[in-house]
């Protein structure tokens, strides 16, 4: 079993990249390799983070079937949370490390020498920052499919197995996800890496009012229930 890194033990600068390869569809990819050049995957455990939209289900194209799924995680409050701040910094460091590697290997990866600025513009970063600063940064992991269904283990707060549909919007979750290669669209008009979620643990659910919750306001008594009709019958 590959080691599972946390934000504290994850070292982006130690990640190496192999030579260009072709997938079954003819597209190219760059495998992640260890220090001996053997293909490997990097498995990372994300700290507890807010899941504002729940598990997102969508179609890449209207005619595509089945659905695709992703886990969109918010860095809300990361400025004062050591673990989420460290993850944000490590993912940013990994983005820069990958862009540096792409620039150094531009001819092999893209067929020609590209400027670092162009590589930055076409690279899909692991963190998405709101330009206005109104919303917290986000990061995303995708969920692979097996036989058309989400291929991920999901655990409730009591560690029992649940389905992706049971994860509520606004929950706090931990995710274990992995990356294994660098992907490219076309000749490199878009490129990057994608975390694939392996396991998801719900650590906290949003509060819901399940019991009677109305309270009397100051100086107000509980109003009597009227049995009279609201309007007189004509």
Show which residues each predicted segment covers.
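OB-fold ssDNA-binding interfaces and closely related basic DNA-contact patches used
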Residues: 1-145
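N-terminal functional modules and adjacent low-complexity/disordered segments of proteins
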Residues: 5, 10-12, 39-41, 180, ...
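Generic alpha-helix signal with a bias toward terminal, lower-confidence helices
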Residues: 58, 106, 185, 207-209
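Generic preference for flexible, low-structure residues
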Residues: 114, 157, 211-213
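Extended serine/threonine-enriched, polar tracts that run as long, contiguous segments within proteins
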Residues: 128-205
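Long, low-complexity intrinsically disordered regions
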Residues: 205-234
């Amino acid at each position: 079993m590959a080691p599972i890194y946390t934000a504290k033990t994850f070292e982006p600068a130690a990640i190496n990249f192999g030579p260009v390869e072709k997938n079954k569809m003819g597209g190219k990819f760059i495998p992640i390799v260890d220090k001996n050049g053997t293909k490997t995957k990097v498995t990372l455990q994300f700290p507890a983070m807010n899941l504002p939209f729940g598990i997102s289900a969508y179609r890449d194209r209207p005619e595509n079937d089945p659905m695709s799924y992703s886990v969109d995680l918010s860095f809300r409050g990361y400025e004062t949370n050591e673990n989420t701040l460290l993850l944000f910094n490590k993912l940013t460091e990994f983005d820069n490390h990958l862009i540096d590697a792409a620039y150094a290997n531009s001819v092999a990866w893209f067929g020609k020498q590209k400027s670092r600025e162009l590589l930055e513009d076409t690279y899909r970063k692991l963190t998405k920052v709101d330009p206005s600063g109104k919303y917290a940064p986000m990061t995303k992991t995708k969920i692979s499919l097996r036989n058309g269904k989400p291929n991920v283990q999901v655990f409730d707060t009591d560690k029992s197995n649940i389905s992706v549909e049971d994860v509520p919007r606004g929950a706090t979750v931990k995710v274990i996800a992995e990356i294994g290669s660098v992907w490219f669209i076309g000749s490199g008009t878009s490129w990057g890496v994608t975390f694939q979620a392996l396991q998801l643990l719900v650590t906290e659910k949003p509060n819901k009012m399940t019991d009677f919750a109305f309270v009397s306001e100051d100086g107000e008594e509980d109003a009597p229930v009227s049995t009279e009709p609201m309007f007189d019958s004509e």
